[in-house]
Curated annotation (Swiss-Prot):
Binds 1 Mg(2+) ion per subunit. It comes from Chlamydia pneumoniae (Chlamydophila pneumoniae). GO terms for cellular component: cytosol. One of its GO terms (molecular function) is XTP diphosphatase activity. Substrate binds at S7, S8, H9, G10, Y11, K12, T71, F154, G155, Y156, D157, K177, H182, R183. Pyrophosphatase that catalyzes the hydrolysis of nucleoside triphosphates to their monophosphate derivatives, with a high preference for the non-canonical purine nucleotides XTP (xanthosine triphosphate), dITP (deoxyinosine triphosphate) and ITP. Seems to function as a house-cleaning enzyme that removes non-canonical purine nucleotides from the nucleotide pool, thus preventing their incorporation into DNA/RNA and avoiding chromosomal lesions. This is dITP/XTP pyrophosphatase.
Amino acid sequence: MKIVIASSHGYKIRETKTFLKRLGDFDIFSLSDFPDYKLPQEQEDSITANALTKGIHAANHLGCWVIADDTMLRVPALNGLPGPLSANFAGVGAYDKDHRKKLLDLMSSLESLVDRSAYFECCVVLVSPNQEIFKTYGICEGYISHQEKGSSGFGYDPIFVKYDYKQTFAELSEDVKNQVSHRAKALQKLAPHLQSLFEKHLLTRD
């Protein structure tokens, strides 16, 4: 069964591929395999809308099942920022380090700040060319560190520490992060749908 990961981001592709391979013998592709196809710009005000926009668009144009996702980081002390703006927090086209710097600067300006709690929320969608849609969510709670640590991962990973851990996401190995992250939790909830689809595919093929 062919399935496309609607991303060109190496880390996301590896994480999702590893997950899919545990469920069945899927024919797995990513947007890197379709250089002429471009996802629409993320312009919605929710991760659900962004994930659906990407998933539906890719499924329609590529003619196969697609997995798409969108993630945001929320910091309660900053009234939920960066929120849906997470990917463009420091401006469209800014680097990950710019987004992290803006967040740390905002937090340092709150002199009486005690609560550094934060959480990632991820929406993952599985979409068919016929507009069949499965949707799941995953949340990972933790806090924002005072400075960047680690060189792995991407985005806000160098400043996010999961509760019960002493290392930032950027200091964890990919294997560990892929077991506890927000995306991992959302993908795990998608597993029954994927397994059912794979079994139906085998029956149809036989």
